[in-house]
UniProtKB/Swiss-Prot annotation:
Signal peptide: none annotated. Belongs to the UPF0298 family. This is UPF0298 protein YlbG. It comes from Bacillus subtilis (strain 168). Its main location: cytoplasm.
Length: 90
């Protein structure tokens, strides 16, 4: 059985405590310049985990990823300019 995962972005004041976030889920990426961590955890525990992480003093802001709720199948629409046949008169 596959667990549904959802990402979250944790903005930090300092990167010293970024290793501590490993206990909440999988740390996917740590940006040293912009001071944020991309973290993945189970979808059913995302709210509880976000509240717990936001309560720490070294955390500025926690934002969830909305990717699981977006439609990722796109329909191809033909371009209006390509739709017309310009070689009719020739």
């Amino acid at each position: 059985m596959e667990n549904r995962r959802q990402g979250m972005v944790v903005y930090l004041h300092s990167l010293k405590q970024s290793k501590m976030l490993r206990k909440f889920g999988n740390v996917h990426y740590v940006s040293k310049r912009l001071k944020y961590v991309v973290l993945y955890c189970d979808m059913d525990q995302i709210e509880k985990t976000m509240d717990k992480i936001a309560s720490y003093s070294f955390v500025k802001k926690v934002e969830p990823s909305y990717k699981p709720f977006l439609k990722l199948e796109f329909e191809s629409k033909l371009d209006k300019a390509k739709e017309y046949d310009y070689k009719i008169g020739i």
